[in-house]
Structures are given as C-alpha cells and as structure tokens.
Amino acid sequence: MSLIGTEVQPFRAQAFQSGKDFFEVTEADLKGKWSIVVFYPADFSFVCPTELEDVQKEYAELKKLGVEVYSVSTDTHFVHKAWHENSPAVGSIEYIMIGDPSQTISRQFDVLNEETGLADRGTFIIDPDGVIQAIEINADGIGRDASTLINKVKAAQYVRENPGEVCPAKWEEGGETLKPSLDIVGKI
C-alpha cells in the first residue's frame, strides 16, 4: 500500500543533533513545517555517509524553503553521536539524527528490511499537516542525489499553494504548470 497522501503515524524516539546532544522527537515535530525524512541502513557504513553529507550540502537551501531534515536508521542515538564525532563526512551534519533501534519508525514508513533489521534507503517529503507528499526508495547499493530534493520540495510547495495545478516532469520554479482538464487530454 502506498503511503503517499497518508499522515505520519505516531512515534516517539531519541535523537542526536550537533550542539544539542540528545532529545526526544515525535511525529508532532514533523508538523507545522515541511519535513524531509531520510532513512538509511546503518551508521559506520559505506554509501550512507556520502548520502548524509550530500543532504548536508543542501541543508541551508532546504532551511530557506522552510524544511527541516531528519535522518533515521535503526542504530541508537548514542551510535549517531559516536559516528558524528568520528566520521569527517558525518561530522559536518547539522540536521537531526533519529535513532530507531526498536524499528518502529522504519516499519511505519514501510522501509524496514525484516531480514536484516535495517532500514532501506528511503526519502520522504512531508507537508506541514504531516502528510507524505513524495517518496523515493533506493536499493542498498544506490546512493541518492540530494540536489533533486530542492526541486521536489518546491514542486510540492507550489502544488499545495496552487490547487488545481500540477507540475510536469522537469518542472522548475517559475516554469509552466498544467491544469488538468478534459481539454488537454491527448494534447500533451
């Protein structure tokens, strides 16, 4: 079942953020603003630090768009802190790192690999009402390109602010949108 258009389910977890150390995060923290939740398999691994560092490179631009980023793995918040303190790539991360050792959040977002107990590579864009608007899931060996998140967020924000309009493929801010109607069926 697709999670697109569904509200984030209740959860409670411990998180780490540079400068704040440990604190609790719940689904309520994802409401009232745009959020991106980035699931990844494991701390102290190979592709994961490259992805998380890539998200960090886009973090300032995402913040300008009113977006908060949360990364999640089935590691504990303690392991996140240790990784942050020991990895040059992960040490640059300013956004929130949620620990999901109970696998609750990974299971709720349907990214838990039940055989390994690890999260798949999943990216979720969530609107201010806590509703999932976009999902991307990648195989274990395929890292994500965080630069595509900026445009996806802008498109999701545009569609939310302009009911009745949709963003076509390769849409960019200021670009032409579509207004679905019978008049354009078969003419695109």
Curated annotation (Swiss-Prot):
The active site is at C48 (cysteine sulfenic acid (-soh) intermediate). Residues 2-158 form the Thioredoxin domain. Its EC number is 1.11.1.26. It is an enzyme of class 1 (oxidoreductase). Induction: Induced significantly under aerobic conditions. The active site is a conserved redox-active cysteine residue, the peroxidatic cysteine (C(P)), which makes the nucleophilic attack on the peroxide substrate. The peroxide oxidizes the C(P)-SH to cysteine sulfenic acid (C(P)-SOH), which then reacts with another cysteine residue, the resolving cysteine (C(R)), to form a disulfide bridge. The disulfide is subsequently reduced by an appropriate electron donor to complete the catalytic cycle. In this typical 2-Cys peroxiredoxin, C(R) is provided by the other dimeric subunit to form an intersubunit disulfide. Its main location: cytoplasm. InterPro entries: AhpC, AhpC/TSA, Peroxiredoxin, Peroxiredoxin_AhpC-typ, Peroxiredoxin_C, Thioredoxin-like_sf, Thioredoxin_domain. CDD domains: PRX_Typ2cys. This is Alkyl hydroperoxide reductase C. It is found in: Cytoplasm. PROSITE patterns: THIOREDOXIN_2. Keywords: Antioxidant, Cytoplasm, Disulfide bond, Oxidoreductase, Peroxidase, Redox-active center. Thiol-specific peroxidase that catalyzes the reduction of hydrogen peroxide and organic hydroperoxides to water and alcohols, respectively. Plays a role in cell protection against oxidative stress by detoxifying peroxides. The keyword Disulfide bond applies. It catalyses: a hydroperoxide + NADH + H(+) = an alcohol + NAD(+) + H2O. Belongs to the peroxiredoxin family. AhpC/Prx1 subfamily. GO terms for biological process: cell redox homeostasis; cellular response to stress; hydrogen peroxide catabolic process; response to oxidative stress. Homodimer; disulfide-linked, upon oxidation. 5 homodimers assemble to form a ring-like decamer. The keyword Cytoplasm applies. One of its GO terms (cellular component) is cytosol. It comes from the Bacteria. GO terms for molecular function: NADH-dependent peroxiredoxin activity; thioredoxin peroxidase activity.
